[in-house]
Amino acid sequence: MDKKKILLLSDDLRMSSGVGTMSKEFVLGTLKHYDWVQIGGAIKHPDEGKIINMNDSIRKELGVKDANLTIYPVSGYGSQQLLREVMSREKPDAILHYTDPRFWGWLYEMEHEIRQEIPIYYYNIWDDWPAPHYNENFYESCDLIMNISKQTVAIVKEVAKKKPRTDWDCTYLPHGIDEKQFYPIDKFGDEYKNVEGMRKQLTDNNIEFIVFYNNRNIRRKLPGDVVLAFKHFCDQLPKEEADKCCLLMHTQPRDQNGTDLPVVAKTIAPDYKVYFSDQKLTTQQLNYLYNMSDVTINMAS
């Protein structure tokens, strides 16, 4: 039987954003079962206007002989015109969009047109109260809502009063990771030498406890609050123990969408060690960072 084709609207799965990373995970993880087309967004996409056929590379990488993935890069989130063109060319069996529905106003303005032909699915990561009742019309326009957490399921059911959701069209589908890429590294194995090498490169020999932050330097990710929280943590320790702790921030130290983190650290935590990892890393290198860290902190809203 021919595989169904899904049209994904989200961050370009080749990008390193959280949405892009998870888009890549569930697309590559299901290529045995579905063909995929993506309208892949970025702030200013360098490939805008191109059509990227990924078949050869993913078939070689995954060993799936009939894997099919095509990406239509776009700056921003796309448009009605682009969607109509892609639907006409690719003839998908369903549309799946991933991230805040308020970014997809143009999509929901044409939902009556789309749903005469194919369903709209929404992968929902809204997991914080109070319930966003202003999303009710968006939820009503989705044939299936897949939710990142059980709390997200509860939020959707609280919001969707005009069209109550059922267990069939409002499901729990949590994030996952590829355990072949992210895994604990045996401290007595040869690979751990790479972890120690990265530790020496990014911190100093006196460090015994690492607090790890892996997010963009933007206001929503609260990097300044993380520095302040680390300062309060160290304040509660004897000086000799605090001197052995560090905050390792894998982010751009300075970003026009965020703040000047070296200045923030020097101003509010001058007595403590804050280090930065600002180079683009491979998945393997990122796994080394997680293995060398004692705790990961994420205060993002």
Region spans (language model):
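N-terminal subdomain of nucleotide-sugar transferases
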Residues: 1-56, 90
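Nucleotide-sugar donor-binding and catalytic loop/hinge architecture
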Residues: 1-4, 165, 184-210, 237-242
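Conserved donor-binding/catalytic core segment of Leloir-type glycosyltransferases
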Residues: 8, 204-221, 227-230, 247-248
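Nucleotide-activated donor-binding/catalytic signature segment of Leloir-type glycosyltransferases, i.e.
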Residues: 70, 249-253, 258-288
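Short His-centered aromatic/hydrophobic patch
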Residues: 97-103
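A conserved, positively charged/aromatic
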Residues: 115, 122, 131-147
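Carbohydrate-associated surface elements
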Residues: 151, 176
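Acidic donor-binding loop of glycosyltransferase active sites
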Residues: 288-301
